[in-house]
Structures are given as C-alpha cells and as structure tokens.
C-alpha cells in the first residue's frame, strides 16, 4: 500500500473500515446522508409520515442452544395500513460465523446489513484476520448510531446480531446474541433469547415459556418458529406461516462449522407441525 493510495486517510493510517473509506471518498453514498432532507420531502416536522412512505419489517427472534445460536424472522413488511410484502427476507448471513436480522425501515435496514457484511469482508482483507465477535458487535453499533439522523425522521433500523464466538472457553456457550436500540446502544442477551420488532413483546412472552438452557438445535428452531407464530397471532405487522402460498419464516443456524441457512423444506415441516398442533388443541378445547 503506497503513501498515495486512497485506502489511506493520512500517512501511516490504513482504512480497514469500508464505511470510513466511503465517507472519505463518496460520503453522499452512505445511507443517512441521503435522507437529510426527508422532513421537507414528506412535509413532516417530526418524521410521522415516514412510516407510511417506506415499508417496515418485523419480527426477529434469536435463540441460543447447546453448541450454537440461531436467528429467525417472519416475512411480512407493512407500509402504513398496507401489506407491502409477504415474502421479505429479514435474516442475513454476514460472515462465516455471524448473521444479522433486521427490523424497522426495510430499505435502510437491508442496506445497513449488507454494508455491514462488506465491512467484515473488507476488514479481513485489509488486516489479514477476521474481526472478533465483540469487534463485529461494536462495528454494527456504530453503523446503527450513524443512522440516527434518519431514525429521528421516522426511518429507524433495529438489528439483532448473532454469532459463534470461536474464542469462547466453553463451546456449548459460544453462541452469542446482541441486540441494539435505535441510537446504537448494544446489549448482550445472557438468558438465551431475544426478539425485536413490533411483535417482540408477544414473541418474548412465548420464548419465556418455551425456552430452557441446554436445548438442542432442533428444539431451538421449533420454539423460535413457535414464538413467531404467537407474535403473528396478536400483531398485524408480523406474518405467520402462509400454507396456501408456501411462505414460511427464514432462519440461520450458526455453530462451530459456520453459518448455514435452514432449508425451506425443514422450515415448512416445522411450521406445518406447529399449525397442526395448534389446530388440534383448538378443536380439543372446542369439543370439551
């Protein structure tokens, strides 16, 4: 890398951050900078109209299990009182040992998590080593904080980061979950699960009843999808399994072997099992 290389911010300092590199060369391409005049465009002084001009996505759940962690999300996106999308993907693999789920303004959230994935790849190429899980969590925290101007205008992004910590002493506790608030504050979940989005209250209530430490991957995936089903039952912005159209939640599992998207066939089998169990329980109570 030469002294005149654009990858250097100043002599002796290489830009291992892709975001900072972009900010130095083309700041107008960064998400928050493109929404500086949103209030004037929407005629809103406080961003109240922003929720109606852009699709919003919810709900995301994350569950740790023995030897790993998973993250799952529903597929619905809403725009005001309209259903903007039935099959939006809200869960993304960001590198070999991490994944992120997004809630909030759909377009900005997808852009943020994709930029985050580029950040991780760029850092590894420049530095020769991948970021630690704590480094990834801090990096995402800063990116959420950088979105604050847009968030104050109603275009908030709230991600959840999960990953397998290769440096963990106990492999059974290597699965980690970090949630964020709208200003970038990070909070690591120590109790094995979390949920974000408009249906998070209902999903967390479900997880609280179903979760137990030391569960295996199969059980964790079942309760994650069951919590999304419970959220969709009470939150109109959360989509449940659509058996007619073949639309089911998406999920990523991460263990010592790396991150892997759960096959749709497996998710369909679990979702149909949940619906069948709930139907049987409902018919049983009706006949009692």
Curated annotation (Swiss-Prot):
Alphabetical list of CDD domains matching this protein: proteasome_protease_HslV
Active site: 58
Gene Ontology biological process terms, A to Z: modification-dependent protein catabolic process; proteasomal protein catabolic process
InterPro entries with a match to the protein in the record: Ntn_hydrolases_N, Proteasome_sua/b, Proteasome_suB-type, PSB_actinobac
Regulation: The formation of the proteasomal ATPase ARC-20S proteasome complex, likely via the docking of the C-termini of ARC into the intersubunit pockets in the alpha-rings, may trigger opening of the gate for substrate entry. Interconversion between the open-gate and close-gate conformations leads to a dynamic regulation of the 20S proteasome proteolysis activity.
NCBIfam families (alphabetical): 20S_bact_beta
Function of the protein: Component of the proteasome core, a large protease complex with broad specificity involved in protein degradation.
UniProt-recorded name of the protein: Proteasome subunit beta
Annotated organism of origin: Nocardia farcinica (strain IFM 10152)
């Amino acid at each position: 890398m030469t002294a005149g290389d654009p990858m250097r911010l100043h002599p002796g300092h290489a830009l291992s951050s892709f975001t900072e590199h972009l900010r130095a060369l083309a700041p107008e391409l960064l998400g928050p900078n493109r929404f500086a005049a949103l209030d004037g465009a929407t005629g809103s002084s406080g961003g109240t109209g922003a929720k109606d001009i852009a699709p919003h996505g919810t709900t995301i759940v994350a569950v740790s299990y023995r030897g790993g962690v998973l993250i799952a999300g529903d597929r619905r996106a809403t725009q005001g009182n309209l259903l903007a999308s039935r099959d939006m993907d809200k869960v993304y693999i960001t590198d070999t040992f991490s994944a992120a789920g997004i809630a909030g303004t759909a377009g900005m959230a997808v852009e943020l998590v994709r930029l985050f994935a580029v950040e991780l790849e760029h850092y590894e190429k420049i530095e020769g080593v991948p970021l630690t899980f704590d480094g990834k969590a801090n990096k995402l925290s800063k990116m959420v904080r950088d979105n604050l101007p847009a968030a104050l205008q109603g275009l908030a992004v709230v991600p959840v980061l999960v990953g397998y910590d290769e440096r963990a002493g106990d492999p059974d506790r290597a699965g980690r979950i970090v949630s964020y608030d709208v200003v970038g504050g990070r909070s690591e979940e120590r109790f094995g699960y979390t949920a974000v989005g408009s249906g998070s209250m209902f999903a967390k209530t479900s997880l609280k009843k179903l979760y137990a430490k030391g569960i295996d991957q199969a059980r964790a995936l079942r309760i994650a999808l069951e919590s999304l089903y419970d959220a969709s039952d009470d939150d109109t912005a959360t989509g449940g399994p659509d058996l007619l159209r073949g639309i089911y939640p998406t999920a990523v599992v991460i263990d010592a072997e790396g991150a892997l998207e759960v096959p749709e066939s497996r998710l369909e089998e679990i979702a149909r099992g949940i619906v069948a169990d709930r139907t049987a329980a409902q018919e049983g109570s009706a006949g009692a």
